[in-house]
Swiss-Prot record:
A Pfam cross-reference name: 2-Hacid_dh_C
Binding-site residues for NAD(+), renumbered to this chain: 159, 253, 278
Listed GO CC annotations: cytoplasm
EC number in record: 1.1.1.290
Protein name in the entry: Erythronate-4-phosphate dehydrogenase
Gene encoding the protein: pdxB
Assembly: Homodimer.
Residues that coordinate or bind substrate: 57, 79, 279
Any one of the GO BP annotations: pyridoxine biosynthetic process
């Protein structure tokens, strides 16, 4: 069995090397092989003999890519979105598809939290006094909501699809008991954080959801964070707003037209990064693990490995806290694990030297809060660090 995988999938060799040799030797002809590829430049000829194709979001999987292949049976995307996959084409050919929903949700939520502590320090903001508006109540929005709840930060969630599903839920109490608000309510919050997929058309499109009309509703003192899909914000409308002197503070991890970036917008951002919010080691590796589990199910075999088998220890595996929790301690804890200013500096210095894709491909190892054990020296201290996701003994 030949398994082709994106070269940027962590631990792909560890997870899949044994699977590609299954059923070898039956006819003595085909040899199992695990083949890495560059996701942006993949061609139909390269994958003409693939039995399994494992991609990330930069690879378009459609008839154009697979028309030379008459044997492929499984396509996996080690990412949360599916807008790069022609699902109807795969269904027509009876090709099994699996994505990795929620694999990097924690990573993105921790990116947002790092951005918030950086901006709070920069502008002397008290985080507990802010209200955060979350657009999108799926996996990532939920993880962010959990962390904000742990910090006692008020927040609102806008998700019309989940709101409709909630109304149709006949169970008592409803499975989802969250209160959803209209977009206009979220746009009035002190912080607006976007966590929706790209949806073109339909009843609730998200393509250019934050357009000139909605941008005009923003106040000068607000913070706008986008760590979902680049097309959710109209970048040219945002640039027009900023060049007109509007004071809204911008954090952009995603950009319209990636890997091309609207260069003129960069100086107007507080934090700018190369679509790496979900790029923690755990976040990327969970995608590999989820596809491994799905392929094992497809092959009717029991999974042999899990992510914990491969994750290394963090550079600072454990710390002890001998004070109660406050915003200063939050700042220190978050930055100890992930300081988003590092990625912002690399982006500004290296974007036009290395290129957008190269920044992503060569992204340094970054860990999640769970990689660090926090020991509290007194049982009277708040367990907020643990509720934020830090490990405990």
């Amino acid at each position: 069995m030949k398994i082709y995988f994106d070269e940027n999938m962590p631990f792909a060799k560890e997870f899949f090397s044994e699977l590609c040799h299954l059923n070898n030797g039956i006819d003595g002809e085909e040899q199992g092989e695990l083949v890495p590829f560059s996701g942006r430049t993949l061609t139909a000829a390269q994958v003409a003999d693939a039995d399994v194709l494992l991609v990330r979001s930069i690879t378009q999987v459609n008839e154009q890519l697979l028309h030379l292949n008459d044997k492929i049976s499984f396509v996996g995307s080690a990412t949360i979105g599916t807008d790069h996959i022609d699902l109807s084409y795969l269904a027509k050919r009876n090709i099994t598809f699996q994505s990795a929903p929620g694999c990097n949700a924690i990573s993105v939520a921790e990116y947002v939290l790092s951005a918030l502590v950086v901006l709070a320090e920069r502008y002397l903001l008290t985080l507990s006094s802010l209200t955060v508006g979350i657009v999108g109540g799926g996996n990532t929005g939920t993880r962010l909501s959990e962390k904000l709840t742990a910090l006692g930060i008020q927040h609102k969630i806008c998700d019309p699809l989940l709101a409709e599903k909630q109304k149709q839920d006949k169970s008592h109490p409803p499975t989802d008991q969250r209160h959803y608000v209209p977009l206009v309510d979220v746009l009035a919050c002190d912080v607006i954080s976007l966590h929706v997929p790209k949806v073109v058309g339909g009843e609730h499109p998200t393509n250019k959801l934050i357009n000139a009309e909605n941008l005009a509703l923003l106040r000068e003192d607000q913070i706008l964070i986008s760590a979902c899909r680049g097309d959710v914000i109209d970048n040219h409308a945002l640039l027009a707003l900023k060049t007109a002197g509007h004071g809204v503070k911008i954090v952009l991890d995603v950009w319209q037209g990636e890997p091309d970036v609207l260069e003129a917008l960069i100086p107007y951002t507080e934090i700018a990064t190369a679509h790496i919010a979900g790029y923690s080691l755990e976040g990327k590796a969970r995608g590999s693990e989820m596809l491994y589990q799905a392929l094992c199910q497809q092959l009717a075999i029991t999974p042999k490995y899990q992510l914990a088998n491969f994750l290394p220890s963090a550079s600072i595996p454990a710390i002890e806290i001998n004070q109660d929790f406050n915003q200063i301690l939050l700042n220190q804890l978050v930055k100890m694990v992930y300081d988003v200013r590092r990625d912002d500096a690399i982006f500004r210095q290296q974007l036009f030297v290395q290129g957008f894709d190269s920044l992503r491909k060569n992204y340094p190892v970054r860990r999640e809060f769970s990689a660090v054990t926090v020991n509290l020296s007194s049982t009277t201290y708040s367990d907020v660090p643990h509720r934020l996701g830090f490990n405990k003994n």
